[in-house]
Amino acid sequence: MIDLKQLRENPEAFAECLSRRGDYDLQAILDLDQKQRELETERSQLQARSNQIGKTIGERMKGGANPKDPEIQNLRQEGSTVKATLSDLEPKERDLKAEIGELLLTIPNLPSDDTPVGKDETANVEVSRWGDEYIPKNAKLAHWEIGENLGILNFERSVKVAQSRFATLVGAGAALERALIQFMLDQQVEAGYVEVLPPVLVNSDSLTATGQLPKFAEESFKCAEDDLWLSPTAEVPVTNLYRDEIINADDLPIFHCAYTPCFRREAGSYGRDTRGLIRLHQFNKVELVKLVHPSTSAAEHEALVKNAAAILEALKLPYRVLQLCTGDLGFSAAKCYDLEVWLPSADCYREISSCSNFLDFQARRGNIRFKESGQKGTQFVHTLNGSGLAVGRTMAAVLENYQQPDGSVQVPDVLQPYLKRKVL
């Protein structure tokens, strides 16, 4: 959530920065905020007058005044009027605060100063590439063709069980998925992340804190009777483990990695990636989440990208890093890098990880704070997250980049101890 105080004090600068992301109505928030502050001032003045009336009556009575004295009667009548007015103001002020809060939830994070300005993904900036020497020269088949030929991927039966955009992994396919998950977790634990296995059903407050609600409600699967949602990413449950908490500053940074199945309706992707593992309603992912001191978040963001990239390098999968422009930036992110892996069948790089720095945006929505030892007050932590990695897309990249002329697939060296085999 954006900082209302910052918006109030610097509306022009705030609006200019936010305009790099699109057109947002900040004036409506400012107008409501002005009304709410006027009501707050009026309430404070009335409360002070009510207190003064009570004090004056008490002093008069203590001094022996007659309760029927006209002055006492007038003060009591005024006191009753003031209390009635206060009673009327309270719901108005409460409703205004709620309306302001709802509007604030619709405003995205401010982009960082070094985020490229652009309307869409065509303005993203390539930062680096790795592994050009590993790009295969004669890869011909798409991963779904390889998987179906080997009998390790079954999409047709998945449609029978559920609908389109689901996959069933069979035999070595299921083993490869499991090996990738275990390898990714092992690597990140070694890098200093603490593994957690969180719930995959999350409540509305959790999705609101991380920024999926209210904007992306149509993208998620909901269990309406229970006010629970199927989590679209482990970012949601892991970050919300600390919602409404005050963390000791000495306990920062907090690093977590988590494997979960993820669920997305993909409502806006009709006709895109209709085959294969790239865009499914249910998929597995290993997520990296950081809660850090504001002074270290920029450095931790760069380190997060390296943690995600280390998986691709260990698998010897060619990839590139893009910095997203303002028009392609996620709703909650202030700055984001995408890692894209090479897919020979498409002859291009495809996203496999997004590594975002949210600054205090999510922490403000989720009320996640920290306290310095010996100091008064609290501050909001900075949160970061990135995929480490999307497992299905990693499998697709392995199948395509490691396919052999005879139709088999070589198992990457680092996965052989997990799979106990060298070839699929």
Swiss-Prot record:
Biological processes annotated in GO = selenocysteine biosynthetic process; seryl-tRNA aminoacylation
Annotated CDD domains: SerRS_core
Its cellular-component GO annotations read: cytoplasm
List ligand-binding residues for ATP. Answer: R264, R265, E266, E351, I352, S353, S354
Has the keyword Protein biosynthesis been applied to this entry? yes
* Described function: Catalyzes the attachment of serine to tRNA(Ser). Is also able to aminoacylate tRNA(Sec) with serine, to form the misacylated tRNA L-seryl-tRNA(Sec), which will be further converted into selenocysteinyl-tRNA(Sec).
Q: Give the protein name, as stated in the record.
A: Serine--tRNA ligase
The protein's organism comes out as Acaryochloris marina (strain MBIC 11017)
The gene behind this protein is serS
